[in-house]
Amino acid sequence: KETLDLIYKYSEIFDNIIDLQDASLSNEYKNLITIMKMGFRSEDWIPPVMYYYSKFKYERLEEFLKLLEFKFAGDWICGITPTVRLDAMNEILKAIEKTTLENLQELFENNEIFKVDLESLNIILQGNIYGKQYAKYLLLKIEYLMGDNTVHLSNHKYITVEHVLPQNPKED
């Protein structure tokens, strides 16, 4: 019975905050989840979001998602191996487990679990991203950042990025 209750609880959480069936979620939250689902090649980021929600509901949920997204995307773009990225998500899960509502701020200030190699990330992002696995995600993220989040982005199953920019632009 306990196991089935737990499965049901997390099934509802998934439906509400990952499949976005909760109408009270902001468009900014929905749009970030949408680009993460469309652009990331892994779903290892989902358990921390679900566990955070199970403990704290909407309390700073969007802020947590932004930190998690930056960590997950940053590590992926920097070429961190899948095993190390999974370990990082597990460390975030452990930190959530130790956190209470009273010390929630400490989770957000935990620079160790959300650490990204900013120097490497900046170098990579200033380089050629054509053909990289994360190029599509970066374009989705740019669209997200440039939008005003007045509407929820469509969650197309397949999205392609073709002929957006020339590979070899002219100097002028």
Q: How should these model regions be labeled?
A:
Residues 90-94, 148-150, 164-165:
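Noncatalytic, beta-rich nucleic-acid-contacting surfaces in large DNA/RNA-processing enzymes
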